[in-house]
Amino acid sequence: MICVGIESTAEKLGVGVVTDDGEILVNVKAQYIPPPGSGILPREAAEHHSRELPELLERALKNAGVEPEDIDLVAYSQGPGLGPCLRVGATAARTLALTLEVPLAPVNHCVAHVEIGKLAARQDGFDFDEPVTLYVSGGNTQVLALKAGRYRVFGETLDLPVGNMLDTFARKVGLPHPGGPEIERLAEEGEPVELPYTVRGTDVSFSGLLTAALRRYEQGDRLEDVCAGLQETAFAMLVEITERAAAQLGRDEILLTGGVAANRRLSEMMHEMAEDRGAEAYTVPPELAGDNGAMIAWTGILVHEHGLSIPPDEIPEKAIVKQRYRVDEAPVPWAARPSRSADSQG
């Protein structure tokens, strides 16, 4: 089976082509860059996606060596995300599936980040079936684990997602978008300043940290030192709540996924924690960390194999988007099952 997945929840646009044994044939991306000093403008991002998607889809199929008639399934990111952006991907996916007369698989974006991480872990030799997952991105900061047939939230941010916090700081101090990689680069050259640390059980709060970091910069601290302090403090908070959730659940597998998982320092801190407590940790590869079409395609295959895809004749009325689609609302009947054939892929 070959699935084409379309990702369009926010500023990133992606098309992935994946087989049902977990082979990623292609994973192409485009990104909307907001105006300097501005955050993501949803309608402008959607216009960018509308312009770029036809060429991106054509390039994906060409690079994968796949003809339209080879496609067995189409998947799209149903939510959560920005409404205008989600609708671009959903409309394209509906049109493609109807044209090809193949099923359409709606995918929860957060679940897809977990599933692509589990796939990559298994392909790298980690037998991860039910890890505690730290999912960190521009729009989400959650500690997730499988319980009672769903991915449940065992910890999360009480205000800003960590990626949004980093991007906001970067924008306020004049760094280009996306801000996370710029902060990571500067932090390597700095000595961490002391900043407030806010953990409540297995939840975190980043608004006070952001305000304090901006104040230190405005008061004359070196940007490199503030970036180092911001990273160390935020990431220590995230590692603490992940460790606490793993201890409460009695789990010894830890998965780090989402766009912020590409940060080397966060990955290093998470792996150090896991080693200290005798657990195994795995960080999703950088090319699969941020939003991408391959994760949608792979999860779409899981959705379809478990009877949750939409038949062609039902697509017009059932292929919708859900801007506030919580991860614990999404059924994941495959998640607790033994590893599939993809486990043996190297």
Curated annotation (Swiss-Prot):
Keywords: Acyltransferase, Cytoplasm, Iron, Metal-binding, Transferase, tRNA processing. The keyword Transferase applies. Substrate binds at residues 135-139, 167, 180, 184, 263. Signal peptide: none annotated. One of its GO terms (cellular component) is EKC/KEOPS complex. Its EC number is 2.3.1.234. Gene3D superfamilies: 3.30.420.40. One of its GO terms (molecular function) is iron ion binding. The keyword Acyltransferase applies. It comes from the Archaea. InterPro entries: ATPase_NBD, Gcp-like_dom, KAE1/TsaD, Kae1_archaea_euk. Fe cation binds at residues 109, 113, 135, 291. Belongs to the KAE1 / TsaD family. PANTHER family: TRNA N6-ADENOSINE THREONYLCARBAMOYLTRANSFERASE (PTHR11735:SF14). NCBIfam families: arch_KAE1, gcp_kae1, PRK09605.1. Required for the formation of a threonylcarbamoyl group on adenosine at position 37 (t(6)A37) in tRNAs that read codons beginning with adenine. Is a component of the KEOPS complex that is probably involved in the transfer of the threonylcarbamoyl moiety of threonylcarbamoyl-AMP (TC-AMP) to the N6 group of A37. Kae1 likely plays a direct catalytic role in this reaction, but requires other protein(s) of the complex to fulfill this activity. Monomer. Component of the KEOPS complex that consists of Kae1, Bud32, Cgi121 and Pcc1; the whole complex dimerizes. This is tRNA N6-adenosine threonylcarbamoyltransferase.
